[in-house]
């Protein structure tokens, strides 16, 4: 029942999201709670940041479509939020925003004992990633990089 309910809610909420140039990034139903909690994470279709106003504008129409669908026969709490900042850096914008921040770089070098590098994000080009490790710039070809993520401190 939960999977079918979730799918039906996603279909309805996607239609509402389109009206605001949004998309439903994820929808979770916490049915073990009383009242149940519907957590919806939204994104803008143009990839700009979500504001509190975007969440607020989406809330009432989303609530109305859920109520009018009669899919839920119980009370619920609706939570609308943005995706927030991911620890993993993927977009060009991420690399510009977090230049100088401490990062962990997971490597896929099969013949190397080094699987993780830690340093300050220095530069990203189309071919390589450069990080500052204790004052020395290390350039890592992107074909050797598995994942780049923010970390809380430099080890």
Swiss-Prot record:
Tell me which UniProt keywords the record has, alphabetically.
Answer: Cytoplasm, Ribosome biogenesis
BP-aspect Gene Ontology terms? ribosomal small subunit assembly; translation
Q: Give me the Gene Ontology terms describing cellular component.
A: cytosol
**Could you tell me where this protein is found in the cell?**
Cytoplasm
Q: Which InterPro entries match?
A: Ribosome_maturation_RimP, RimP_C_sf, RimP_N, RimP_N_sf
- This protein's major location comes to cytoplasm
Q: Which family does it belong to?
A: Belongs to the RimP family.
Q: HAMAP family from the xrefs? A: RimP (MF_01077)
Known role = Required for maturation of 30S ribosomal subunits.
**The name this protein goes by in its record:** Ribosome maturation factor RimP
What gene name is given for the protein in this entry? rimP
């Amino acid at each position: 029942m939960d999977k079918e309910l979730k799918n039906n809610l996603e279909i309805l909420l996607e239609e509402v999201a389109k009206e605001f140039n949004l998309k439903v990034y994820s929808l979770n139903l916490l049915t073990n709670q009383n009242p149940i909690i519907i957590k919806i994470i939204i994104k803008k279709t143009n990839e700009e940041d979500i504001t509190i106003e975007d969440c607020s504008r989406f809330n009432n129409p989303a609530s109305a479509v859920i109520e009018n669908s009669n899919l839920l026969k119980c009370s619920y709490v609706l939570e609308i939020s943005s995706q927030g900042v991911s620890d993993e850096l993927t977009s060009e914008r991420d690399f510009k925003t977090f230049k100088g921040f401490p990062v962990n770089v997971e490597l896929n070098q099969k013949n190397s004992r080094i699987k993780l590098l830690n340093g300050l994000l220095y530069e990203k080009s189309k071919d390589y990633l450069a990080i500052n490790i204790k004052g020395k710039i290390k350039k890592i070809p992107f074909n050797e990089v598995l994942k780049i993520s923010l970390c809380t401190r430099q080890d």
